Amino acid sequence: MARIAGVNIPTQKRVEIALQYIHGIGAAKAKEICGKVGIPVERRVHQLTDDEVLRIREVIDSDYKVEGDLRREVAMNIKRLMDMACYRGLRHRKGLPVRGQRTHTNARTRKGPAKPIAGKKK
């Protein structure tokens, strides 16, 4: 089992699919990485040589932000918005939708479970 960017990559899957197990790499970036390294997309991970795995690792480390670094950057961006006290930061702080969605109904994922209101029983 190959280990790239701190993630165990499944060996039986195609390289293009297996790279998507890394946080921060989707379908487009996986194809791009395969193109840079010169690996056919349909090749399986267990067919890769150690040199090819090393080249994939180097490309990801030099060109992309993945896993912990990406998570940390996203968290820092949200924290920066909250510290600035701009509209988006206030929405994050209150646990409400940030991108303009309605909250009169819906938004249960962001707001959490519905809180019962006293005297509302029928």
Curated annotation (Swiss-Prot):
Region: Disordered; residue ranges are 94-122
Keywords (alphabetical) are: Ribonucleoprotein, Ribosomal protein, RNA-binding, rRNA-binding, tRNA-binding
Task: Please name the InterPro entries in this protein's record.
Answer: Rbsml_uS13_C, Ribosomal_uS13, Ribosomal_uS13-like_H2TH, Ribosomal_uS13_bac-type, Ribosomal_uS13_CS
Q: Tell me a GO biological process for this protein.
A: translation
Q: Does the keyword Cytoplasm apply?
A: no
Q: Which GO terms describe its cellular component?
A: cytosol; small ribosomal subunit
The answer to whether the entry has keyword Calcium is no
**What's the short name of a Pfam family annotated to this entry?**
Ribosomal_S13
Query: What GO MF terms are annotated?
Result: rRNA binding; structural constituent of ribosome; tRNA binding
Assembly, in brief, is: Part of the 30S ribosomal subunit. Forms a loose heterodimer with protein S19. Forms two bridges to the 50S subunit in the 70S ribosome.
Q: What is the similarity comment for this entry?
A: Belongs to the universal ribosomal protein uS13 family.
Q: Which NCBIfam families match?
A: uS13_bact
Q: What job does this protein perform?
A: Located at the top of the head of the 30S subunit, it contacts several helices of the 16S rRNA. In the 70S ribosome it contacts the 23S rRNA (bridge B1a) and protein L5 of the 50S subunit (bridge B1b), connecting the 2 subunits; these bridges are implicated in subunit movement. Contacts the tRNAs in the A and P-sites.
Query: Under what name is this protein listed?
Result: Small ribosomal subunit protein uS13
